[in-house]
Design a protein with these regions (language model features):
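Ferredoxin-reductase
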Residues: 2-82
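A short, basic/flexible loop-to-alpha-helix module at the beginning of a structural domain
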Residues: 89-97
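Conserved beta-strand elements of the Class I
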Residues: 104-106
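Histidine-anchored nucleotide/phosphate-binding helix
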Residues: 114-123
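Conserved S-adenosyl-L-methionine
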Residues: 124-128
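Short internal beta-strands
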Residues: 129-136
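Anionic-ligand binding region
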Residues: 142-148
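Conserved small/polar residues in nucleotide/adenosyl-binding loops
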Residues: 149-154
Length: 161
């Protein structure tokens, strides 16, 4: 089930030259699992933009997106206080109800954001999580520090690239 709503931009900041993190305030009751996504309507664009949810709580949603075209470039220019029309609670997401004792999460590029909330959920359930991240270049790396704490034996980020 999904919900359409208007969400207020709280933050919109670059993480790298091409990757941005946007935090939105609004109703999150239809988001039920890590790995779900939203569809964003943008002024002057016919199609909505699907963006995976990085994190959420009962009042806000964090999205991470890469600027790859006109729509995401338009998003990168948006300022706190502006609003967006979203469809939320889309996709099945990831289930954490399984017998996995040591889950291995693998993601790269814009496939990394949905793993953040999944890792948080699994850790809250007492499951030690291992994370493998991939990026095209070192300049494109983001959220490595946020996900590094989930690894059972933290490595020096400078030598692990």
């Amino acid at each position: 089930m999904y919900k359409k709503g208007i969400y207020k931009i709280l933050t919109n900041e670059p993480l790298t030259d091409a990757v941005w993190r946007m935090t939105l305030a609004g109703d999150t009751q239809w988001i039920s699992a890590p790995g779900q996504f939203v569809n964003i309507a943008l002024e002057g664009k016919y199609l909505r933009r699907p963006i995976s949810i990085c994190d959420y709580d009962d009042r806000s949603i964090a999205l991470i997106y890469k600027v790859v075209g006109g729509g995401t470039e338009q998003m990168s220019r948006m300022l706190p206080g502006e609003t967006l029309d979203l469809l939320t609670g889309l996709g099945n997401g990831f289930s954490t109800k399984n017998d996995a004792r040591r889950p291995l999460l693998v993601g790269g590029g814009v496939g990394v954001p949905p793993l953040y909330n999944l890792a948080k959920r699994l850790l809250a359930e007492g499951k030690p999580v291992q994370v493998v991240l991939g990026f095209n270049t070192a300049s494109e790396v983001f959220y490595e520090d946020c996900l590094l704490y989930t690894s059972p034996s933290p490595r020096d980020p400078k030598t692990s690239r």
